[in-house]
UniProtKB/Swiss-Prot annotation:
PANTHER family: QUEUINE TRNA-RIBOSYLTRANSFERASE. Substrate binds at D89, S90, G91, G92, F93, D143, Q187, G214. InterPro entries: ArchSynthase1/Queuine_TRR, TGT, TGT-like_sf, tRNA_ribo_trans-like. Keywords: Glycosyltransferase, Metal-binding, Queuosine biosynthesis, Transferase, tRNA processing, Zinc. It catalyses: 7-aminomethyl-7-carbaguanine + guanosine(34) in tRNA = 7-aminomethyl-7-carbaguanosine(34) in tRNA + guanine. GO terms for cellular component: cytosol. The lineage of its organism: Bacteria, Pseudomonadati, Pseudomonadota, Betaproteobacteria, Rhodocyclales. Homodimer. Within each dimer, one monomer is responsible for RNA recognition and catalysis, while the other monomer binds to the replacement base PreQ1. This is Queuine tRNA-ribosyltransferase. Binds 1 zinc ion per subunit. Gene3D superfamilies: Queuine tRNA-ribosyltransferase-like. The active site is at D89 (proton acceptor), D264 (nucleophile). Catalyzes the base-exchange of a guanine (G) residue with the queuine precursor 7-aminomethyl-7-deazaguanine (PreQ1) at position 34 (anticodon wobble position) in tRNAs with GU(N) anticodons (tRNA-Asp, -Asn, -His and -Tyr). Catalysis occurs through a double-displacement mechanism. The nucleophile active site attacks the C1' of nucleotide 34 to detach the guanine base from the RNA, forming a covalent enzyme-RNA intermediate. The proton acceptor active site deprotonates the incoming PreQ1, allowing a nucleophilic attack on the C1' of the ribose to form the product. Its cofactor is Zn(2+).
Amino acid sequence: MQFDLLKTDGVARRGTLTLAHGVIQTPVFMPVGTYGTVKAMTPQSLNDIGAQICLGNTFHLWLRPGLEVIAAHKGLHDFMNWQKPILTDSGGFQVFSLGAMRKITEEGVKFSSPHDGAKLFLTPEISMQIQKVLNSDIVMIFDECTPYPATHEEAAKSMRMSMRWAQRSRDEHNKLENSNALFGIVQGGMHEDLRDESVAGLCDIGFDGMAIGGLSVGEPKEDMARILAHTAPQLPTHKPRYLMGVGTPEDLVYSVSAGIDMFDCVMPTRNARNGHLFTRFGDVKIKNARYKLDTGPLDSSCSCYTCTNFTRAYLHHLFRNGEILGGMLNTIHNLHFYQTIMAEMRTAIEVEHFTEWAAGFARDRSSGQ
């Protein structure tokens, strides 16, 4: 892996990230393909909307279809027919989400399969072994996502165990001779001093890139902004910075202004399937009756397949009738919109016009339909 920082505008960064399956232009948004598929999108559709890299979910792919199936395809790329880079998360967040179904110990996490109730055990070592089989370009360490809210004592205990798991992840990744990139994950809840301790510890261990975890887990926006603004500047300048699970278009712009390079979130795809569409001039809830006779495009400024071929009335009709095509067209648009935002930010940073671009984007988004 190689990361090249090409340009800065204020704190915003423009770079390239060279991985085994291609070169990524940053800042970048990564669509989420939990089960080896971005819901309602074909690999060709992902290419068409400009996706450079997508996510797979270690936890879910381990359970279904299982490693034997993916190993038979020599990894996730051939299995899902996506020859661009893939990042896989470690399974930590999914285990965290199981709540009462799991028990966290120093060794790892014991839990019951959400599919058949089978007793399972996931450790940093097993997570690294799974991700080696998946052959993802970027591997994430196994950590505990600190819940919100958490007291200082609770967050410290969680973060320090994640730090020990980070070392075990690093050791196993090396032992497996996995040549793909390994990213550390900063934890520490809403406590700046714990975030500082986490960054320092991860830097001592040594990782190819650094992620900020434990945000967008239910905390107020002000807390997320506070922790992001505090933590991002401390991350190594010469390594990619990844903000996990974020977020809205406005979140992306704010986070790029804080120095983040990489993002993922289910929001554009999940919202699309629920009829919540992002446009340049505000959000559209396509089920609303006001769109029944609307013969205009969803977003007059958008060049995606949906906006250049179909009316709001048609999208309204599809959604109201539960047609599969509705979810597909909505998802194409939302992901295209996110990719367009990222491309515009990259250009704005290149020409040192980011602040002006961000102000214009905010004006457009708040102007309404």
